[in-house]
Amino acid sequence: MNNTAKLALGAVAVVVAALLGITFLVPGGPSIGGPGPSNEASLAPEPTPTALRASVGEGRLEPGTYVSHPLASNPLLAVTFTVPDGWYAFDDSTLVPLGEGFEGPDGAVLAFLEISDVYSDPCESLGDPDVDAGATAEDLADAFSAQPAYEASVTDLTLDGYSGKQVEFQLPSEFDASCPRDEYFVFGGGPYPQGPDNRWHLTILDVDGSRLVIFTHDFAGTPASRQADLESMIASIEIEIEIED
């Protein structure tokens, strides 16, 4: 393993990885064995049929409108967004571009996350996160900006009528090889950096008592078309609290 940290995508991603012949890293698990999914037909499942508000699910996505339910604490919170051509879903809340994958120097990711706590030292992340991040968008943004291990700039924003914070991270260009497992966790459960100079963009929203984190990452080498895809998906987002049956 080199000292470049890898992305934790959860147990569902491991299942998808088995289908693709790729090994993904989850906390405490083995390292990634290769890049993200490619456009090779032999490596990707059949495209998911386009449907209005189809669940994101897993596999290669046809362009269209999809819905994700990313919060375990509030499963009725629904995020609807439009996916352009050339994207693959690892699970209900994590998308990567076909071809580039998620690693540097040209990868990208869109994910919907639930973050409760952060690490004061991302290099010492074997235990639970040690900094409480409160319950609001401002609380989490303040927790990030207070940590000296990385640079995080915070601005106010509104998305689909919900107010929150935009946090831009510039992560270290190199990670200390003495980090346990060569990993660098900013918050519990991943994701974590995919290569030197990985750029993170977090949109943190207060949504009717819940906190939703919309996470994207890219690199200087990420194609402009993929960066435009990320921007268009975020711009298309509509958030609602569904009525329980």
Predicted regions and their residues:
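Surface-exposed beta-strand edges and their flanking turn/coil or helix-capping segments
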Residues: 125-127, 165, 179-184, 226-231
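N-terminal targeting sequences that direct proteins away from the cytosol to non-cytosolic compartments
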Residues: 2-111, 115-116, 120-123, 192-197, ...
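Second-shell loop/turn segments in exported
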Residues: 127-131, 154-156, 217-224
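Cys/His-rich zinc-coordinating "finger/knuckle" motifs
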Residues: 94, 130, 186
